[in-house]
C-alpha cells in the first residue's frame, strides 16, 4: 500500500465505525494518553508516517484486531 492508500483505508475504517477523525483523536488522548492534535493526526496519515503502535490503538478503538497471517 502506498501512503495515499493507507490514508484512505484508515479514514474509511474510521467512518465505517461511526467515528470522526476528531473523535478518534479524543479517544487516543483519553484512553491511551496519546497527545496528538487533529491536524497532527491528519498530517501523519497524509505523510504515511503513522506508527504501527498508533495503528494498533486506532484499530482497537474502532473494534478491529490487526492479524498477521502467514502467506501460503
What function would you assign to each model-found segment?
Residues 1-21, 27:
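A short, Lys/Arg-rich alpha-helix, primarily the initiator
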